[in-house]
């Protein structure tokens, strides 16, 4: 098969291919970028595979960086871009169900493509826009099927993370998982316990943000892979409710929103503790926790000025979007209106600080000063006190007389 044209992302990288070929080696575009070109999807990273060994690649180009030379990868800086050029290779026995014990460089493209995970990721593309398809990936692409390259059991036993990648591809591409591939994913799902939490997080996060995330969750449920992810041992009913709760075409707008929705559906009592186990950042944990808090109090009451001040309008709107996707009442206008009424959005905007109160009104550092500053802040947020020095000092004087 031949593409009708070579997309601009490949055209920009074409000089790299041409230089490698001029030096007497083979070179092709490979991986997800070729798949995405065939599906008319946006192309991101352009990867190149070559029969040239790393040292040979480095001799061809003036500017290179060793970014994974032990695995055959050299970063080539050419034509204003950065391109990973990886030597054709085969892989030895895998250790820890994730990494090969060693790699061997080879001169055969087919040997290199054999080690890929799925047939739709095992294409190569030459400089003439001709697609090399050794494993009937084009047929799978036409039929929207996700199929492992070769024996599925071997692929997942080599690298258990491919199970999560498969679920993610089903969600991002809207592909059905081929029967034998699905069976192998199910029978090898227990190996996910061997995979680092950080890598599992990346794949599950991409699944949640995919356009067809519901398909990915359904496959996660069907393969029972969720049972081998940290703290995801909920019942099938809770996972099914997660899918059912949201409108069919709803897409999450951020990772934080997606994880908040997940934890709400699964009824986790301690989101911060859960997210720590997934080794997420403190800021990520705080944002997810805040979204969950907002969603829960919105089931009981309206948004207040204090809510807008504490959480910020953007986070409130993000939580409101989850309500909208669940067909619940929303009030974006109220959030915007209250935000417009706020005299301050941060306590540092208050014109009187603790130093001034100590200097002019005799306050000492301690709980009394802290309570007074908090009272000032709350009164300004509630619109009961103007944010000017005269009003604030009078407010404090009145407090002291009570």
UniProtKB/Swiss-Prot annotation:
PANTHER family: CCA TRNA NUCLEOTIDYLTRANSFERASE 1, MITOCHONDRIAL. Its cofactor is Mg(2+). It comes from Streptococcus thermophilus (strain ATCC BAA-491 / LMD-9). Homodimer. Mg(2+) binds at residues 45, 47. It catalyses: a tRNA precursor + 2 CTP + ATP = a tRNA with a 3' CCA end + 3 diphosphate; a tRNA with a 3' CCA end + 2 CTP + ATP = a tRNA with a 3' CCACCA end + 3 diphosphate. Catalyzes the addition and repair of the essential 3'-terminal CCA sequence in tRNAs without using a nucleic acid template. Adds these three nucleotides in the order of C, C, and A to the tRNA nucleotide-73, using CTP and ATP as substrates and producing inorganic pyrophosphate. tRNA 3'-terminal CCA addition is required both for tRNA processing and repair. Also involved in tRNA surveillance by mediating tandem CCA addition to generate a CCACCA at the 3' terminus of unstable tRNAs. While stable tRNAs receive only 3'-terminal CCA, unstable tRNAs are marked with CCACCA and rapidly degraded. CTP binds at residues 32, 35, 116, 159, 162, 165, 168. Its EC number is 2.7.7.72. ATP binds at residues 32, 35, 116, 159, 162, 165, 168. This is CCA-adding enzyme. It comes from the Bacteria. CDD domains: NT_ClassII-CCAase. Belongs to the tRNA nucleotidyltransferase/poly(A) polymerase family. Bacterial CCA-adding enzyme type 3 subfamily. InterPro entries: Bact_CCA-adding_enz_type3_sf, CCA-adding_enz_C, CCA-adding_enz_firmicutes, NT_sf, PolA_pol_head_dom, PolyA_RNA-bd. One of its GO terms (molecular function) is CCA tRNA nucleotidyltransferase activity. A single active site specifically recognizes both ATP and CTP and is responsible for their addition. HAMAP family: CCA_bact_type3.
């Amino acid at each position: 098969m031949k593409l009708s044209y070579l997309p601009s992302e490949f055209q920009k990288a074409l000089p790299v291919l041409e230089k490698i070929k001029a030096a007497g080696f083979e070179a092709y575009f490979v991986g997800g970028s070729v798949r995405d070109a065939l599906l008319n999807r946006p192309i991101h990273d352009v990867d190149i595979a070559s029969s040239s060994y790393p040292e040979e690649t480095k001799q061809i180009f003036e500017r290179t960086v060793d970014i994974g030379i032990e695995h055959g990868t050299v970063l080539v800086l050419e034509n204003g871009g950065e391109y990973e050029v990886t030597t054709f290779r085969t892989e030895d026995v895998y250790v820890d169900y994730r990494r090969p014990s060693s790699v061997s460089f080879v001169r055969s493209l087919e040997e290199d493509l054999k080690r890929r995970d799925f047939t739709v990721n095992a294409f190569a593309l030459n400089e003439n826009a001709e697609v090399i398809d050794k494993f009937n990936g084009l047929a799978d692409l036409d039929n929207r099927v996700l199929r492992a390259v070769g024996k599925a059991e071997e692929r997942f036993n080599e690298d258990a993370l491919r199970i999560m990648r498969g679920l993610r591809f089903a969600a991002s591409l809207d592909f059905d998982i081929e029967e034998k591939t699905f069976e192998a994913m199910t029978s090898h799902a227990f190996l996910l316990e061997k995979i680092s939490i950080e890598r599992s997080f990346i794949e599950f996060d991409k699944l949640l943000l995919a356009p067809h995330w519901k398909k990915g969750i359904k496959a996660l449920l069907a393969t029972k892979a969720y049972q081998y992810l940290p703290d995801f041992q909920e019942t099938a009913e809770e996972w099914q409710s997660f899918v059912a709760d949201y409108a069919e075409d709803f897409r999450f707008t951020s990772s934080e929103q997606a994880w908040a929705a997940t934890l709400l559906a699964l009824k986790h009592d301690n989101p911060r503790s859960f997210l720590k186990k997934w080794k997420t950042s403190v800021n990520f944990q705080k944002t997810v926790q805040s979204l969950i808090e907002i969603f829960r109090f919105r089931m009981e009451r309206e948004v207040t000025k204090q809510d807008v001040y504490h959480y910020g309008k953007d986070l409130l709107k993000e939580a409101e979007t989850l309500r909208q996707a669940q067909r619940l009442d929303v009030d974006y206008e109220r959030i915007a209106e209250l935000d417009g009424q706020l005299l301050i959005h941060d306590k540092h905007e208050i014109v009187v600080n603790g130093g001034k109160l100590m200097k002019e009104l005799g306050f000492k550092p301690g709980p009394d000063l802290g309570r007074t500053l908090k009272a000032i802040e709350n009164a300004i947020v509630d619109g009961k006190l103007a944010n000017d020095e005269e009003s604030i000092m009078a407010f404090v004087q009145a407090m002291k007389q009570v």
